[in-house]
Amino acid sequence: YVSYVRLKHNGQFKTNLTKDWVNIVGEQYFTTEKPGFIWKGKTAMFVARDMYLADEGRLIATILSTINVVDIHGKQQYDESELLRWLGESGWFPTNLLPSEKLKWTAIDNSSAKLSFDYNGLSLYYIVHFNSANEILEMETKRYMNEKRLETWIVKPNNYEERSGIIIPMQAEVFWRLKEGDFSYAKFKVTEIEYNRPEKF
């Protein structure tokens, strides 16, 4: 079982669905026994920190190294959104997706299932689609775009490879499925990943 994960990635990111892509590099740390993560992403313009720590979700964006232009936390919508991110990125540490008291799978058909996760008063779910190799193709849920707007949010892992004896996706794309269409805003490629190393890179 994986208890800790640390990874590095590169890729592209959009700060707004109507903005251009910017290059990004990041590193991320996960805990599994108690849900938690810290992600730090750097672009030429800003540094973003996304996290779920001590059962609280938080997003901080900084420019010029010291000026916080975004600091969002303290509401259940953000706690739920960041916990959804943690769960949606479990493909990088798939023992996290084994059935437990908190996590249940319900078959839908031969290639899809509902993943339910109950934790700290929050009830989350994903509709998960698999390919013929039983690799996750897509995870779909409802996530808050802001405090009041709940929309369809999709994680698409791909390019599966073996790392430390575990088959994981080395790339992932994230997008919103809105009535106007699908809007991708993050494309990450894992460049380094290690398990059960709780210390910082």
Model-derived regions: residue spans:
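Short, hydrophobic/aromatic-rich segments at coil-to-beta transitions
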Residues: 3-8, 32-39, 108-116, 136-138, ...
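Short amphipathic beta-strand/extended segments with alternating polar/hydrophobic composition
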Residues: 47-56, 68-80, 127-130, 184-189
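Short, solvent-exposed aromatic-acidic interface loops
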Residues: 41-47, 64-70, 142-146, 173-179
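Short, exposed beta-strand/loop patches in secreted or surface proteins that constitute
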Residues: 26-31, 51-52, 102-108, 128, ...
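Gly/Pro-enriched, hydrophobic low-complexity segments
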Residues: 113-195, 199
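Short, solvent-exposed secondary-structure boundary motifs
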Residues: 11-23, 36-44, 88-100, 115-121, ...
